[in-house]
Amino acid sequence: MNITATVLLAFGMSMDAFAASIGKGATLHKPKFSEALRTGLIFGAVETLTPLIGWGMGMLASRFVLEWNHWIAFVLLIFLGGRMIIEGFRGPDDEDEEPRRRHGFWLLVTTAIATSLDAMAVGVGLAFLQVNIIATALAIGCATLIMSTLGMMVGRFIGSIIGKKAEILGGLVLIGIGVQILWTHFHG
């Protein structure tokens, strides 16, 4: 695979993480760049590992992985999105309430895993091609780092406009990504 194809693949794989990061950024009270970078690093690290895991699985049992990865991503994203929507409806904006300035590490890891299962499936497919899987996985991780950090900052802007309802929007985005993954699986 040439460099152009690798870069296009990398940024294509980062789009789900970008959308999820917008939702995450919108739900925080003015996240700092360091929080956006933290999110980008977590999403990028997970997105680097999943094609490597997929590649290894592709060498062993590609049929099972391809058969179930979309369902796993769908369920995780519906769960996380539903949780965000419920949080968004819990009470009005409250001036006395301490605004959230960062997401928990494990929440970000779970979201990153859910949005990177397509990269695992790509890794399975790459097992059957002549590619440098390490370079490809690093390219996907770097693109995801960039796009997730950018997504958090875009989300910051959106969140400052719509306030606590951003939690509902973020949840809807995650559910939308889950539905899109399932739709793409069944309708190509």
Swiss-Prot record:
The keyword Manganese applies. One of its GO terms (cellular component) is plasma membrane. GO terms for molecular function: manganese ion transmembrane transporter activity. Keywords: Cell inner membrane, Cell membrane, Ion transport, Manganese, Membrane, Transmembrane, Transmembrane helix, Transport. The chain crosses the membrane at residues 3-23, 66-86, 106-128, 143-163, 168-188. It is a multi-pass membrane protein. It is found in: Cell inner membrane. Coiled coil: none annotated. Probably functions as a manganese efflux pump. Belongs to the MntP (TC 9.B.29) family. This is Probable manganese efflux pump MntP. It comes from Escherichia coli O7:K1 (strain IAI39 / ExPEC).
